[in-house]
């Protein structure tokens, strides 16, 4: 909170701001570098809420994570040329910007993964390391995802596999 206050006062007084807390993500000062590092750090799963992902460098990193076998799920819109699958949020309007990494860390802020919001506008976010908060964010994402077309297909496939296992167990 102290670091956010320093940022506010620097902006209010029209003074330059130099980020001091590694968990604070501030555009345009450090958002591209910190969010890039955050995305690159995903080993198993990357769950993204973002109304409009269009930054080429960030999409390149996301595509690399997909190639590396990371389960990447994006709720929002993704620029089509990248062929990165996404789902519409099942609610009325998606406004949140959040990324949940490997169920252990999360980013929550006002930055979309768009060039304008990473490089030009004053936007602020935070890297969350509190396991309880991250778990709650993960649970909300999973509930939202279950309502999407992909989520419904995944649930149907899992139910079919479960029935098959039950039949095999009953036959033996």
Across the structure, where does each feature detected by a protein language model lie?
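PLD/PLD-like phosphodiesterase catalytic module centered on the HKD motif
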Residues: 1-32, 41-172
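Acidic, amphipathic alpha-helical patches
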Residues: 35
